[in-house]
């Protein structure tokens, strides 16, 4: 196509309006037209990455194939577009400042006074252009975290102003705002949108397209009013009404010609509207599913759904491909005990023992693992969930009553989960775990091999602790098989009990690899087993 086109997505009025979903939807529509598209997220916080953030603070920490701990929006980008993102797709203010300060310490600025403008803004601009320059994408969509008016966002908005001036028709700004409905007056109010756009204009950025989040349809007069007072064309005012699923949003945007408006404004041919056949097939299959499969998620962050966002989406996708709707029941591992486990888990079709860190709520995960093993309920343990399945097995089948992970009990005599050798000398917490995609070889006579239908796989990891190979023989002899092994480190990646319907734990995070059009085979297999329970 020639020069890379840059689309900036900003937000106003309120946070959590769905900039990530709009960015993903734009990306999906452009991708469907044959363009090579990627999406990046700029987060205005000063952490280097979200790896050390509490899930209650920031939701799930997503992991890219190259081992970067990233914002959960990258999960949306990958699920919608079926692409793989990298460290370059998620930048924080902390990383920007660290890069500039490191350059200053090296003497790269030749003794100049380092300032927000031009040094910080130049570093932001360099990172915006990096993906286009290095990988020759046709479109780079850049989502700016936060809300217009936040102090933290100012350097990013100044960078957008400069880039729009420098790139001309090759840069475009989509601004997402909220149109509230006042029930007392039975009226939609556009004033917050007008003020948000005015705030953006005061910073030198004129939005080219407005996407209005709303719970009610916006009539033509209201759209004309917004267009007039915000200096945008009428066809550039698009509504984003509440949908039953986020996966409907690309179709809703396509119906209003959002992708066509973008192409026109960037001087590109519009051509035929792509049919999005497989995407529509997925949505039709989802809508036509009448039966429900009930899955319990046992974890310590269950009050906040975003803490397990990728798992929820993976279960939802897998259920669709099994022609089912999925009902999720959240079970707090902190409050799960032998006395109430039957009430909590006895009626469900399957159980996911969620990942996590630390000892809080760990005993409840052991209770869940024991109950589902003894009652032959399909069970999927992920990362710490897999470790809990192994510890429970050691305690109640092998007879090691004090079996534990070194993470939870440094004095345990039976450390069936041990710290990885290369982690022993590490003291810093941020970005130091075993992160990213690693190879795994599957045993052919296993349920996981049946699911994957291939022997060599690659999956993403985020952990410091591993299954202790000193116990492997005892586990195997007692019935828990180690069926997935890393060929380089001999690390146990997957355990399963083949005599049970579906009792599998993975040290890796399969949820990071599941997409709308290619659901993860383990989740599909798990849901199928849960249906057959």
From Swiss-Prot:
Active site: 383 (nucleophile), 509, 511
Catalytic activity, EC: 6.3.4.2
GO molecular function, one term: ATP binding
Catalytic activity, as annotated: UTP + L-glutamine + ATP + H2O = CTP + L-glutamate + ADP + phosphate + 2 H(+); L-glutamine + H2O = L-glutamate + NH4(+); UTP + NH4(+) + ATP = CTP + ADP + phosphate + 2 H(+)
Binding-site residues for Mg(2+), renumbered to this chain: 73, 143
Binding site for ATP: 16-21, 73
Residues that coordinate or bind L-glutamine: 56, 356, 384-387, 407, 464
Binding site for UTP: 15, 189-194, 225
Amidoligase domain: annotated span: 1-268
GO biological process, one term: pyrimidine nucleobase biosynthetic process
Any Gene Ontology CC annotation: cytosol
Gene3D superfamilies: 3.40.50.880, P-loop containing nucleotide triphosphate hydrolases
Keyword Transmembrane on entry: no
Domain Glutamine amidotransferase type-1: 301-533
Protein keywords: ATP-binding, Glutamine amidotransferase, Ligase, Magnesium, Metal-binding, Nucleotide-binding, Pyrimidine biosynthesis
Biochemical pathway: Pyrimidine metabolism; CTP biosynthesis via de novo pathway; CTP from UDP: step 2/2
InterPro entries: Class_I_gatase-like (IPR029062), CTP_synthase (IPR004468), CTP_synthase_N (IPR017456), GATASE (IPR017926), GATase1_CTP_Synthase (IPR033828), P-loop_NTPase (IPR027417)
Function field: Catalyzes the ATP-dependent amination of UTP to CTP with either L-glutamine or ammonia as the source of nitrogen. Regulates intracellular CTP levels through interactions with the four ribonucleotide triphosphates.
Entry's family note: Belongs to the CTP synthase family.
PANTHER family: CTP SYNTHASE, CTP SYNTHASE-RELATED
Subunit architecture: Homotetramer.
Extra facts: CTPSs have evolved a hybrid strategy for distinguishing between UTP and CTP. The overlapping regions of the product feedback inhibitory and substrate sites recognize a common feature in both compounds, the triphosphate moiety. To differentiate isosteric substrate and product pyrimidine rings, an additional pocket far from the expected kinase/ligase catalytic site, specifically recognizes the cytosine and ribose portions of the product inhibitor.
Protein name per UniProt: CTP synthase
Species in which this protein is naturally found: Bacteroides fragilis (strain ATCC 25285 / DSM 2151 / CCUG 4856 / JCM 11019 / LMG 10263 / NCTC 9343 / Onslow / VPI 2553 / EN-2)
Organism lineage string: Bacteria, Pseudomonadati, Bacteroidota, Bacteroidia, Bacteroidales
């Amino acid at each position: 196509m020639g020069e890379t086109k840059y689309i900036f997505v900003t937000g106003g009025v309120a946070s959590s309006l769905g900039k990530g979903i709009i960015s993903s939807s734009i990306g999906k529509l452009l991708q469907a037209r044959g363009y090579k598209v990627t999406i990046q997220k700029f987060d205005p916080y000063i952490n280097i990455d979200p790896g050390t953030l509490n899930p209650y603070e920031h939701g799930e920490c997503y992991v890219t194939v190259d081992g970067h701990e990233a914002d959960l929006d990258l999960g949306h980008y990958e699920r919608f577009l079926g692409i793989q993102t990298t460290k370059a797709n998620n930048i924080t203010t902390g990383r920007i400042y660290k890069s500039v300060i490191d350059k200053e310490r090296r003497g790269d600025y030749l003794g100049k006074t380092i300032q927000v403008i031009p040094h910080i803004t130049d570093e932001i601009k360099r990172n915006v252009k990096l993906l286009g320059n290095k990988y020759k994408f046709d479109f780079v969509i850049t989502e700016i975290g936060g809300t217009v008016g936040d102090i933290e966002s100012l350097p990013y908005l100044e960078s957008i102003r400069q880039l729009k001036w420098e790139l001309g028709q090759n840069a475009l700004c989509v601004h997402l705002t909220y149109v509230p409905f006042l029930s007392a007056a039975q009226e939609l109010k556009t004033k917050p949108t007008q003020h948000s756009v005015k705030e953006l204009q005061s910073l030198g950025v004129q939005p080219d397209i407005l996407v209005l989040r709303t719970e009610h349809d916006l009539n033509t007069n209201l759209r004309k009013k917004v267009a007039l007072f915000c200096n945008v064309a009428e066809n550039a005012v698009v509504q984003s009404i509440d949908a039953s699923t986020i996966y409907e949003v690309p179709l809703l945007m396509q119906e209003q010609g959002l992708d066509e408006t973008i192409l026109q404004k960037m001087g590109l041919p519009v051509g035929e509207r792509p049919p999005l056949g497989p995407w529509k097939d997925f949505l039709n299959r989802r809508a036509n599913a009448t039966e429900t499969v009930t899955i319990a998620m046992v974890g310590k962050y269950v009050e906040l759904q975003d803490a397990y966002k990728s798992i929820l989406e993976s279960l939802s996708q897998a259920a669709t491909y099994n022609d089912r709707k999925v009902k999720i029941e959240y079970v707090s591992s902190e409050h799960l005990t032998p006395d109430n486990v039957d009430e909590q888990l006895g009626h469900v079709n399957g159980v996911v023992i969620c990942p996590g860190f630390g000892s809080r709520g760990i005993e409840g995960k052991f209770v869940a693992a024991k109950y589902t093993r003894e009652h032959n309920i399909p069970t999927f343990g992920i990362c710490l969930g897999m470790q809990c399945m192994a510890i429970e097995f050691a305690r109640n089948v092998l007879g090691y009553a004090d079996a534990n992970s070194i993470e939870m009990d440094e004095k345990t005599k039976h450390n069936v989960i041990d710290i990885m050798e290369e982690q022993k000398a590490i003291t810093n917490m941020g970005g130091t775990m075993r992160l990213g995609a690693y190879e795994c070889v599957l045993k052919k006579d296993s349920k996981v091999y049946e699911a994957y239908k291939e022997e060599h796989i690659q999956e993403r990891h985020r952990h410091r602790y591993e299954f202790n190979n000193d116990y492997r023989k005892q586990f195997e002899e007692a019935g828990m098989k180690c069926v997935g092994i890393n060929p380089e480190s001999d690390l146990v990646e997957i355990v399963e009990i083949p005599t049970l319907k579906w009792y599998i734990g993975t040290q890796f995070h399969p949820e990071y690899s599941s997409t709308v059009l290619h659901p993860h085979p383990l989740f599909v297999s798990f849901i199928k087993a849960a249906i057959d329970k």
